[in-house]
Design a protein with these regions (language model features):
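Catalytic cores of glycan-processing enzymes that make or break glycosidic bonds
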Residues: 1-218
Length: 218
């Protein structure tokens, strides 16, 4: 495992996307979207007074003006973590976290099992590589992102759940409760209902996105 943060992970099991599927949404796939996008324009925002130190010690220039790559030995978050393992001062932590963010600044993550298949990186809309896209590219990417994270896996995960969860629920006499808060696929509610798994209800975290607080009557 080369990543420290979960942003570079992938669901298991999952249905990764081929280049052709990605481009069917009107988004042109490029190999550079798999590499960290590191541009001169935002390094100061990430590293502040440590910018020049970072450029000299962790980055290398490319043939494209203003674009950098990570130096060998610092190309993965795990390599960065190992380098800073005995450096616990505030400045070192600042630099380490900044380097983590550079390395995760990718649009797609290659699938670990299927060559030529990819996952849109979760939460990438908040990162610099997404901001570098044109408005048309952002719109196309958001369409494929929404399809991947909120629709593509529904039936697949429902099938997976019905294979595995009954063995768990039938193996105990305890009351079973599922943690179904946050980002969950639409199939979760029906699966839990079919298997009589209790839902976790917290009034401050309503399942209806239109409500700020949950209504006890619902």
């Amino acid at each position: 495992m080369h990543a420290v943060h979960g942003l570079l992970g992938q669901f298991t099991p999952s249905l990764p996307m081929s280049r052709e599927e990605i481009e069917s949404f009107g988004f042109t796939f490029r190999d550079e979207y798999l590499l960290p996008y590191i541009h001169e324009s935002f390094l100061g925002q990430v590293f502040g007074p440590h910018t020049e130190f970072v450029k000299q010690n962790f980055l290398q220039t490319t043939d494209v003006s203003g674009i950098y790559h990570m130096k060998p030995g610092f190309e993965t978050q795990r390599e960065v973590e190992n380098f800073f393992s005995d450096r616990k001062d505030e400045d070192s932590i600042w630099i380490r976290e900044g380097l983590y963010s550079l390395i995760s600044n990718v649009l797609f993550v290659p699938d670990k099992k299927e060559e030529g298949k990819y996952h849109p990186r979760i939460g990438v809309q908040r990162d610099f590589i997404f901001r570098s896209l044109s408005e048309a590219e952002k719109n196309a990417f958001n369409k494929l992102y929404d399809q991947y994270y909120y629709h593509r896996h529904n039936a697949f995960w429902q099938q997976q759940a019905m294979k595995k969860l009954p063995q768990l629920t039938q193996s105990t006499r305890m009351l079973v409760c599922g943690e179904d808060l946050g980002m969950i696929p639409d199939c979760v509610a029906s699966v839990m209902n079919d298997l009589r798994i209790l839902s976790l209800e917290i009034q401050r975290m309503p399942k209806n996105p239109l409500h700020e607080f949950g209504h006890l009557s619902e």
